Amino acid sequence: MTLAAADRPLTLLVVDDHTLFRRGLIALLGQDAGLQVVGEAGDAAEALHLVPRLRPDVILLDNHLPGVMGVDAIRGLREVSPHSRVLMLTVSEDSQDLAAA
């Protein structure tokens, strides 16, 4: 199964509570014609609200969001958008965090 049809860009939702990082990542991704950032969220609740409407192919998700770990957020995101793939982002070197991801 492919994530996006060859005639359209891969759609992305970027979820990270650090605005500067999130905006920088969006700017970087925007340079690739094969990618289209369709939305951004600063926390899991906002992402859960956006995903059913935006239906992104891929969700780029920070592992450490306010009030919820990324692994827990993935469960909720899969419920509202089972077709979306989730790519977790983290700067953590904690082996338990990495194993859970």
What is each residue range found by the language model?
Residues 15-16, 41, 59:
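Conserved sequence signature across two-component system core domains
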Residues 17, 89-93:
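Conserved active-site segment of CheY-like receiver
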Residues 72, 93-101:
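Alpha4 helix (beta4-alpha4-beta5 surface) of REC/receiver domains from two-component response regulators
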Residues 50-54, 76-84:
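Conserved phosphotransfer cores of two-component systems
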Residues 1-11:
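Non-catalytic signal-transmission and effector/linker regions of two-component phosphorelay proteins
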Residues 43-46, 69-72:
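Acidic catalytic/metal-coordinating carboxylates
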Residues 34-42, 50:
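Short hydrophobic/Thr-rich beta-strand motif most characteristic of the beta2 strand and flanking loop
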Residues 62-63, 90:
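Active-site residues of response regulator receiver
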